[in-house]
């Protein structure tokens, strides 16, 4: 990807709630709660891309409250990522957020050189206690994905669902498996076509892959990537959204969406930085539905069109998930076509 110049879009915010990991040893010299935290986002894709857009949205919300002064760089290549991290660190930013799935080691090496700066990074790996200023997160929205799968299983007539993903990494795999488990609640014999396009942002390729699945009999698509819902719309089949709600753009196509809310994750990090307790931790828990980190989007134009039995099961399971009496399996293995 082409590296863009550092964008400086500043925003102001207020304090975020109780601190994460109270009493834990964290970064030295905590900032005053009233002082906005200088925060930088580093993204390898445009901020319009669905996954990154949720991080960006949460940062914008925090800036509006006065919690942070926020700037960001988008379309940063993997080869430039560590350099951009260093640039922000040298400029005095106190909280750096982003996604390091392709630069895991390099990002940690940078963080080790700046022990007084908090790094909160999307990662396929867990935290390392030896690197106290580097916390990780991921979009553990398997709860909402499972519920959207129940709806998909009830709406497919061909019992054939196409699933297009970016890469077969844990944060994608677990959502696909949860979706498949939900669909099988309605029909254990559903067939799944699974494919990965090898890119986080290539709508034309995702669209062509989806077309092939429709030709293979799929009448319902799982849109893990942009471009899939376009194919569904053109061919007159249905789709389930992922991470963001795109029904406004596809009112006759997208039945439901599993939504990721990054606000609980970022707010916990902001509180920890303010309290001086930020340390190596796995912030992935804040994406769980019971933490407010994920939800099922309203059915909107499909209200009343999903079979009642499916919606009754969705309501039952959603209540149980929030109460902690039902757990959706987290399966990070690569899903396969059936």
Show which residues each predicted segment covers.
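An alpha-beta-alpha
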Residues: 59, 145-187, 194, 282-304
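Flexible loop/hinge segments that line or gate small-molecule binding clefts
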Residues: 112-138, 243-253
């Amino acid at each position: 990807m082409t590296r863009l110049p550092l964008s400086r879009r500043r925003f102001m915010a207020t304090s975020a709630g109780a601190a994460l990991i109270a009493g834990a040893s964290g970064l030295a010299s905590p900032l005053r709660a009233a002082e906005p935290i200088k925060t930088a986002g580093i993204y390898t894709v445009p901020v319009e891309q669905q996954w990154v857009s949720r991080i960006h949205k949460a940062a914008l919300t925090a800036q509006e409250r006065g919690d942070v002064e926020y700037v960001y760089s988008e379309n940063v290549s993997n080869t430039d990522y560590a350099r951009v991290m260093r640039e922000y660190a040298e400029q005095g930013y106190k909280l750096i957020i982003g996604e390091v799935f392709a630069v895991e080691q390099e990002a940690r090496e940078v963080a080790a050189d700046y022990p007084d700066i908090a790094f909160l990074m999307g990662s396929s790996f867990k935290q390392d206690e030896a690197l106290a200023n580097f916390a990780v997160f991921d979009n553990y929205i398997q709860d909402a994905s499972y519920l959207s799968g129940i709806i998909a299983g009830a709406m497919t007539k061909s019992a054939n669902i196409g699933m297009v993903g970016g890469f077969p990494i844990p944060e994608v795999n677990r959502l696909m498996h949860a979706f498949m488990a939900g669909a099988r609640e309605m029909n254990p014999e559903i067939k799944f076509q699974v494919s990965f396009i090898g890119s986080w942002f290539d709508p034309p390729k995702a669209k062509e892959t989806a077309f092939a699945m429709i030709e293979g009999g799929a009448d319902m698509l799982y849109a893990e990537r942009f471009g899939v819902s376009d194919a569904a719309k053109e061919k007159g089949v249905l789709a389930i959204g992922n991470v963001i709600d795109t029904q406004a753009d596809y009112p006759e196509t997208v039945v439901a969406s599993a939504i990721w809310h990054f606000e609980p994750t970022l707010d916990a990090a902001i509180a920890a930085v303010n309290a001086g307790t930020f340390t190596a931790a796995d912030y992935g828990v804040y994406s769980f539905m019971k933490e407010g980190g994920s939800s099922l989007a309203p059915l909107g134009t499909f209200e009343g069109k999903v079979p009642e039995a499916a919606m009754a099961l969705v309501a039952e399971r959603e209540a149980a998930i929030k109460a902690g009496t039902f757990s959706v399996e987290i399966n990070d293995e690569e899903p396969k076509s059936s």
